[in-house]
Amino acid sequence: MTKGILGRKIGMTQVFGENGDLIPVTVVEAGQNVVLQKKTEEVDGYNAIQVGFEDKQAYKKDSKSNKYANKPAEGHAKKAGTAPKRFIREFKNINVDEYEVGQEVSVDTFEAGDIIDVTGVSKGKGFQGNIKRHGHARGPMAHGSHFHRAPGSVGMASDASKVFKGHKMPGRMGGNTVTVQNLEVVQIDAENNVILVKGNVPGPKKGLVEIKTSIKKGNK
């Protein structure tokens, strides 16, 4: 069954494996995960748990700041006997009998060697051209060429007389939800609520990441 936890990306470092190989790892701090709600097939049509991560300040009247929880969020968290949470996610296809509302989920849910999928929001790159954004090839840089990094033709002259939807063009790059699949858990540090994941994961330092059992290899 699926297992899941929320955390923040701390950065990257290196560790040595048992055979002496140097392994690049991403350090993820995943503490303060609390089960806010259980969803069952009988009531909701599917099995899932709702997990909250990082405390948010209690409701403050007339405040429009995001650092304060609103009344519905505060009431929802109170049912679980915890403070309102900044990030809330659902993990489906999970054995709900193993969890209770208000229970803390720690990093030792996973073990070294587990295969996982990690979801995060990719780094924003700003407005970029076709070459960087879509990997298009550039034109010649010499011999009288007038075509270097321009996108080229984007549509027909008279027959269609328009640019079709979905055409790859310059624009805002990054800031998308990205999932990297089939990463390996290298090490668990339960005392410091830290998971070491082999390779890189999406997002900047201090970015929120969602770690769950691999959808392709985790249940085999």
Curated annotation (Swiss-Prot):
Gene3D superfamilies: 3.30.160.810, Translation factors. GO terms for biological process: translation. Disulfide bonds: none annotated. The keyword rRNA-binding applies. GO terms for cellular component: cytosolic large ribosomal subunit. PROSITE patterns: RIBOSOMAL_L3 (PS00474). Keywords: Ribonucleoprotein, Ribosomal protein, RNA-binding, rRNA-binding. SUPFAM superfamilies: Translation proteins. The keyword rRNA-binding applies. GO terms for molecular function: rRNA binding; structural constituent of ribosome. Part of the 50S ribosomal subunit. Forms a cluster with proteins L14 and L19. Belongs to the universal ribosomal protein uL3 family. NCBIfam families: L3_bact (TIGR03625). HAMAP family: Ribosomal_uL3_B. One of the primary rRNA binding proteins, it binds directly near the 3'-end of the 23S rRNA, where it nucleates assembly of the 50S subunit. This is Large ribosomal subunit protein uL3. The gene is rplC.
